[in-house]
Amino acid sequence: LLSKKIEVFVNIMQISEIEEKAIKKICFFLQPVKIKALYIADSLGSLNNKSFLKVANKFKKFWSGELGLHAHDNLRLALSNSLLATKSGFKWIDSTISGMGRGPGNLKTEEIIKYYNLKDIKFVRLLKKKYFDRLKKHYKWGTNKYYKFAARQKIHPTYIQEMLSDKRYGKKNYSSIANSLKESETTK
């Protein structure tokens, strides 16, 4: 890909679960590849600001190239973690209109635009209203108390997404199912 003048980004998932030894190996392996940036993804959406900085500093310790962040919004911390990333030297932050993404969603474009007081906010709000609000209602992305619970327990959001979309269960079952997921995660 690089020989075809295609810029390559590598996304490392579930960064909240990676130990420093593995981070060092990943960075050492990728260093000679000349990728555009090494992206880290908070796949479980479980990183608070302090834990994000701890993980980010581990990557910065071993990676000399550009860094990027893909923040999930389970705990409603995608914006604050993204702002911390930029303040600590990350060059790349991604976002989606209305936080569009599987399950709890991602950093919302309109939040980052509003924070930086950019002129594009009216256009993004128009797109959101015209297209994305309807899509969000149909596909039901966005965080809720079950995604927040999963993030705190380090349960992958796919389990919650499956639970919420399974017609066999109703709201009265969700808490007991989420708690059983917690129990099965702690027995691993």
Regions found by a protein language model. Give the residues of each.
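Catalytic cores and adjacent flexible loops of soluble metabolic enzymes
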Residues: L1-K188
